[in-house]
Amino acid sequence: MNLIKVNEIKPYSKNINCVFIVLDKGPPTKKKEGTIYQVLVADSTASINMTVWDALGEQIQPGDILRLKGGYSNIYIELLNLYVGKTGIIEKIGEFTFPFVEAPNLSSTLWNVHQDPNNPKNMVATPKPSPHKQQQPMQQPTPPMTHQMKQPPMQQMKQLPLQQQQQQQQQQQQQQQQQQQQQ
């Protein structure tokens, strides 16, 4: 199995094999075909939105480290999305400690979709130029960090530098100790 990094995912890729951590999970969306879950996943190179269905989506939680086998990518409403697919497999291989970056988020780039001039049966996607790109200074990508999250994970999913997270955890521990002493 050939693993790729998240930043190597391109539109209309097939048989994607990669390892990532779940950063966030959106609320379920009920459709007549089933229930859809949107999760934000990342590795040390980038992040991307992934769509999962039904029981699989219900089981996935922020902080889970997952291995995707046989996934695919597609453009949905001009945004790049990662999918498990009918033949894809997701395996939970760990929890909470995994180097990741939140930027760039591959699902935040808008894409133009059009027919491939060399093969009209295929669609191709090219990034749309951003009208604000020239006005904004270039941002350096966030360096990879290993985050250790404590339960409950959703409270720890804020975009805080590691030092601030550690300070916040220490404050929470002190508050818990004070509460225990008062009881």
Curated annotation (Swiss-Prot):
SUPFAM superfamilies (alphabetical): Nucleic acid-binding proteins
Coiled-coil segments on the chain, per record: none
A single cellular component GO annotation: SOSS complex
Ranges of the DNA-binding region feature: 21-90
GO molecular-function terms, A-Z: DNA binding
Region (Disordered): 111-183
UniProt record, GO biological process: double-strand break repair via homologous recombination; mitotic G2/M transition checkpoint; response to ionizing radiation
Record keywords, A-Z: DNA-binding
Record field: compositional bias (Low complexity): 132-183
Composition skew (Polar residues), residue ranges: 111-121
Homology family: Belongs to the SOSS-B family.
Descriptive protein name: SOSS complex subunit B homolog
Organism: Dictyostelium discoideum
